[in-house]
């Protein structure tokens, strides 16, 4: 395994083929206590890891095929592995990363939110959504669908978390108000997707058996603030088995509040994922309040980086805009947004309007239907492609901006924070 990513424990020189030492098992744990997992590594790295464990390197391919291709972690189902070492080998390469704590469903079972407890006691949430056949191709969180819409049962999208909490501090977002606990490992991200893919494949949600077709990095956390783990996870999600889960890169969306250097770096990765920029205001005065990182990278810098991403990848950029009543829904802001999207992104720009989802204690609400309709009309009249997001999961606090695990972690409640003050908006919104 490469330097910096090798298992930390040194193996005994006299390790036999089927006997794994305590050092090898200890080496499967990172310094922060998060277990190393097969999904953290490329297939070549997995081969070297297995060889260091004293097993033939092709065992890595076999276990990878089970995890990514057959969507199983159960050693009893891996009958091509020797019975004498099967459980121990699987236990080292596929340690449990997520434990379900609570599951809530709505939309007649077509939307499911799961609260996960991680190995160190941190919590994250993910949301699985099934859309009927011929549903609007942009409704699922702005993600693009495969040509067949996912399956004959309709597209299935997973909203995945990349961090426990979030450090961006956006005042209208429950996760942003919770604060950052830690980054997730690549495998912790991939595990959310693998569980969802298995759930859909086995028909364990409404609509019967199907295929997970889309993944959006729009759950808890700022994906590009956890850059290396997110990019590694995207590769595991999109590479074909036994390397990964085989979901099309074009069906993966990575969102960001606008970390300009990370956007520019993402453009060099050779990935064809959709970039979604959480803009929420066309002017720096208001965006400084709604998205505090704007003080570091203002609107034009963010859109400039998004334009370069679109130019390099030839992929459409989705501009995310949460409509907040009497805050950012004024007609002149619609006109300003349209002008900026046309200037920077042209035909590769798309605006995804999001009716603000309620969060506990927040004084803000969604725009009125009339204001929303006028905002849409002005964007469309200016020649900008625009859609209004389907607000799936509101009933279970699983919609955009609502994810924040309300649980105790290391002595503090993760969601219970004071409602944001409106004072800072008094001048900016006018």
Swiss-Prot record:
Specifically methylates position 2 of adenine 2503 in 23S rRNA and position 2 of adenine 37 in tRNAs. Belongs to the radical SAM superfamily. RlmN family. It comes from Acidothermus cellulolyticus (strain ATCC 43068 / DSM 8971 / 11B). It catalyses: adenosine(2503) in 23S rRNA + 2 reduced [2Fe-2S]-[ferredoxin] + 2 S-adenosyl-L-methionine = 2-methyladenosine(2503) in 23S rRNA + 5'-deoxyadenosine + L-methionine + 2 oxidized [2Fe-2S]-[ferredoxin] + S-adenosyl-L-homocysteine; adenosine(37) in tRNA + 2 reduced [2Fe-2S]-[ferredoxin] + 2 S-adenosyl-L-methionine = 2-methyladenosine(37) in tRNA + 5'-deoxyadenosine + L-methionine + 2 oxidized [2Fe-2S]-[ferredoxin] + S-adenosyl-L-homocysteine. It is found in: Cytoplasm. Its main location: cytoplasm. InterPro entries: Aldolase_TIM, Methyltransferase_A, RNA_MTrfase_RlmN, rRNA_lsu_MTrfase_RlmN/Cfr, rSAM. One of its GO terms (cellular component) is cytoplasm. Keywords: 4Fe-4S, Cytoplasm, Disulfide bond, Iron, Iron-sulfur, Metal-binding, Methyltransferase, rRNA processing, S-adenosyl-L-methionine, Transferase, tRNA processing. The gene is rlmN. This is Probable dual-specificity RNA methyltransferase RlmN.
